């Protein structure tokens, strides 16, 4: 399944900017790897887009943002695979969208 999401906020700067779009792909048979950017359905924070910082012994994901405005890994907690919606496939910078208009 493909997901299209608009970036809201600055927690993934400088990689992803507020207003950018990403397309993510859900993986069924393969796992996600450290440093991949994923979309997660978090029980407390809703849908969040973060980078996998660590995979623990229980195969749960610990996330971090690229920017200083991000929640800490400890605040987000360990994320099980069934909460992952998908991994970044394409990044569409908002500056390109303004050129197209």
Where are these regions (language model features)?
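Extended hydrophobic leader/signal-anchor segments used for secretion and membrane insertion
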Residues: 1-101
